[in-house]
Structures are given as structure tokens and as C-alpha cells.
Regions:
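ATP-binding N-lobe of GHMP and related small-molecule kinases
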Residues: 1-98, 115-122
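Conserved small/polar residues in nucleotide/adenosyl-binding loops
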Residues: 137-142
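Acidic, glycine-rich active-site loops and adjacent beta-strand->loop/helix elements
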Residues: 92-94, 133-136
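DPxDG-like acidic metal-binding loop motif
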Residues: 98-127, 131
């Protein structure tokens, strides 16, 4: 099976308002714009018992094994929402920890891919467990 290719665009907050804080998360409202800058994600189904995630590119150094993409897959596996395992290669063109949403947008785009390909059914409430940014970019998720 060949890889599916996904572009994961950087986003920038044009305005940001913190509404409240619950636990370690902030409830925010924001005006954002997507940039032409993007990471490239390759994804394919594999015959393995674990997902494989690999980061390449000039901004891949220092990305920890516990990251937004691995958290996404861990939650999906814990909830038994996905039948198969996937190999994911992410070419990092977006610098890390720059406030451009690189990791969150990577997870959001992978989740959006799984939803659009009808490989997963997930509720918006469950997406919030992963990231607010994931909810922002996954419009096909179920409301309830």
C-alpha cells in the first residue's frame, strides 16, 4: 500500500482572548489564519501491533516520543476506535515551539484524515481530550 500525503499548515493567532482556566487547560477564543508554511505527513496502514511515528526534516530534532501525534494515537487505541495500525512520517518544515501550531495541526490533520476516510468515528467531546486545535480542524466529527 502506498502512502497518503497530507499537508499540515501552520497557523498564527491574530487575536487571542483567554476566557477561563480549568485544570491545566485554558478556554480561549481566537482569530487565526493559516499560512503557506506546512509540514508534510505521509500515512499508510501497516501490518503491525503498534503504530510507527517518525519525524524527519530540519525541525525534527528534539521532538520527544511523547508528543501530540503519539497522544492522539494513544487515546484512539485506548478507546478502540481504530482497527488497524499506521506508519506516519512527518517532515517538519514548521519550527517547534514557535506558536505556529505545528504539533497540534499535525494531530488535527491526521485525525481529520481518519475521519474523512471513515476509518474512525469520534465525538467532538473526545477530540477535546487531545487538543482544542484538533477540534478546530476536524469539522466532520460527530456532535454527540
Amino acid at each position: 500500500m502506498s502512502y497518503f500525503k497530507i499537508k499540515s499548515h501552520a497557523k498564527i493567532n491574530l487575536a487571542l482572548n483567554v476566557l477561563s482556566k480549568s485544570h491545566s487547560l485554558h478556554k480561549i477564543e481566537s482569530i487565526i489564519s493559516f499560512l503557506d508554511l506546512h509540514d508534510e505527513i505521509l500515512i499508510k496502514k501497516i501490518d503491525d501491533k503498534n503504530h510507527k511515528i517518525r519525524f524527519i526534516g530540519k525541525f525534527s530534532n528534539g521532538i520527544k516520543s511523547r508528543n501530540t501525534v503519539s497522544l492522539l494515537l494513544k487515546i484512539i487505541d485506548k478507546k478502540k476506535l481504530l482497527k488497524n495500525k499506521y506508519k506516519i512520517i512527518i517532515k517538519k518544515n514548521i519550527t517547534t515551539e514557535a506558536g505556529l501550531g505545528g504539533g497540534s495541526m499535525n494531530a488535527a490533520n491526521i485525525l481529520n484524515f481518519l475521519i474523512k476516510k471513515k476509518l474512525i468515528m469520534i465525538k467532538k467531546k473526545e477530540i477535546l481530550e487531545i487538543s482544542n486545535s484538533c477540534l478546530l480542524y476536524t469539522s466532520d466529527a460527530a456532535d454527540e
